């Protein structure tokens, strides 16, 4: 019945001119053709499409059948013989139908699926889509629309993380990336071959450029890469990245020029639209490009060999900042790798303090601190700590001094502050061992820095448990200074400032320890009484109530806190003992001299 209906509609339309086809004819053709497909009359439908007499009708109306045919092809339960006929019908429709209508129809079909069906749809439709676009005159608009639609769908797919996931490619992203390169190549070649640089060719370049930058952001920003020595040829993302960077050069945007122009006042693009997009969207793409070139070494041979390590570091710091602002493990990891790659090219103590006037040279170490303190992944926390130390090592003395002040003022984390204080101690030690003192870690400059170290933020009421790492590091630094610097020499300026240190740090610390120990001892007593009654209870630590827990666990927490206070108290007592010994010894020496 469906076949007869379709033949009747076609017979009526055969006698009409193309411009006389009515909207009603299109609707009836679509309904009858769709029923033929649903009822399995595919052989008869194929004959109708192949009939030369129906060529004009198929050209104008046939695109309505593409959707039903494609949906049948995407169904895995069809017999092989049926699938073969569906493919023949589909190929004929692509060959015969109006390319403008086909383009929109194919893009709608690409947008329909979700989940794992996204890649199946794309892999099926890429080749026909390429064929259709090559028939159109306005290629720039068409390729732009197609690439944008394809990228939007691919960006919905999860990026495989491990080697096993990449090999399994459950969602088909890796296959799609490879197929997308093959889809795009003819249009890149068309740009290369067109020597006239017509307006249409320039527009095509721009659309390809947009696609390349979108691809650098997704999937390449989060994609993992094999080691080059390990199965490098089988790494789909390395292949995709290499081709995308190659496309950039081929369409007249070699990546060295692009990455070194990024962020400058001089505009990189010819069109305002691109300039606005660069400012808002392309930071991730540029960071991804820098990582691919400098860490993965993709097309690195195109870079000028004369670039200095300091220049490359300055260039990369903005991109590292972008990486560290993200939360994905793979993206943060890339930022750390790029930072390490850039820093290892530079000699220790050679990074001048003036570089810290550049915003990213301060925001990157602050970003490292955030990863160290907030990231849930231990390997990234440890790597960030190592990178912060490496960064400190590269700075000159004034740069180290400036960075220490900055991080002490901004980190708000006892462990980080303890780490900085240990670095300050190391710099003082190196300075005292030199024949010529380093002015940044001796005398007035050091005293100014010690003002940020040897004090309690809230005086005697400071939470000593929460600040225990910082306090212990500060006491150890003070003990070191008392031992190493004689009062008569006073190279560090410590002995001049000792009165202030005692008033601002040592005395409040004594009071705070007494208050804290009394509080925790009272809590231990309460917990022991609760243990006798075998009830759950709550305790207050640092002004906050700890959730209900068994009394045995509470006692462990409380005794651990008391142990920390005892440790601080013992170091404090030793520091005060050393001060007394040194002061007395100096007084006796001075009396002897007289």
Swiss-Prot record:
After translation, the protein is modified as follows: Phosphorylated on tyrosine residues.
Please tell me whether the keyword S-adenosyl-L-methionine is annotated for this protein.
no
Q: Does the keyword Cell membrane apply?
A: no
**Alphabetical keyword list:** Acetylation, Disease variant, Phosphoprotein
Q: Name one GO biological process term.
A: muscle cell differentiation
- Annotated region (Alpha-helical region with structural similarity to HEAT repeats), positions in chain: 2-553
**Reported tissue expression:** Ubiquitous.
> One GO MF term, please?
ubiquitin protein ligase binding
- Which residues are recorded with the post-translational modification N-acetylalanine? 2
Q: Which GO terms describe its cellular component?
A: Cul2-RING ubiquitin ligase complex; Cul3-RING ubiquitin ligase complex; Cul4A-RING E3 ubiquitin ligase complex; cullin-RING ubiquitin ligase complex; cytoplasm
Alphabetical list of InterPro entries matching this protein: Glomulin/ALF4 (IPR019516), YAP-bd/ALF4/Glomulin (IPR013877)
What segment(s) does the record annotate as region Important for interaction with RBX1?
300-594
Domain of life according to the entry: Eukaryota
A Pfam family that the UniProt record links to this protein:
Kinetochor_Ybp2
| Record annotation: effect of changing residue 219 to A | Loss of interaction with FKBP4 and FKBP1A
Disease connection: Glomuvenous malformations: Characterized by the presence of smooth-muscle-like glomus cells in the media surrounding distended vascular lumens.
What does the entry's domain section say? The C-terminal half of the protein is important for interaction with RBX1.
How is the subunit organization of this protein annotated in UniProt? Interacts with FKBP4 and FKBP1A. Isoform 1: Interacts with RBX1 (via RING domain). Identified in complexes that contain RBX1 plus one of the cullins CUL1, CUL2, CUL3, and CUL4A. Identified in a SCF complex composed of CUL1, RBX1, SKP1, FBXW7 and GLMN. Component of a SCF-like complex consisting of CUL7, RBX1, SKP1, FBXW8 and GLMN. Interacts with unphosphorylated MET and is released upon MET phosphorylation.
Q: List the protein's name.
A: Glomulin
What's the gene?
GLMN
